[in-house]
Amino acid sequence: MLDALLQEGLDAVRVSLNSAVKDLYECYYQPIGYGWEDVEASLALARRRRAYIALNLLVFPGVTDRLGEVEALVELVRRHRIDQVQTRSLAIDPMQYLEVVRGRGAPGPGTGVEQLIRRLKQAAPWLVIGNFARGLNERLQCRMATEHV
């Protein structure tokens, strides 16, 4: 299906993931009719067809920023020369998520989300990294601007 869409002119692909590690990805998404290998194959196909590839990275501090998870993400980004990573907060009950992911994914100490982003920038200087969430200063500026209208 993706191949046909790319042949018809699709020029951008966005993939959401919580991890670049198969067991952690699959325990969260619980895919039916596809698996992590299909995600990887789709990324490879999109790259061969020169589509713009963006990842929605669902971030859960303490899991997403584990050293092994960071390195797996870096390898995925480099392997498929991902163009953009858009970070998103994983909005889920933290206790539920920690129970589901226990013992899954790549191990290692938490590095912090700031270090995760720094590592991505270092390993893939071409990568665009963004987040739609606005920082406190930007939110305050927007609020002040609308109050004076």
Identify the role of each PLM range.
Residues 67-149:
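Auxiliary Fe-S-binding modules of radical SAM enzymes
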Residues 1-100:
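Conserved AdoMet/S-adenosylmethionine-binding subsite of the radical SAM
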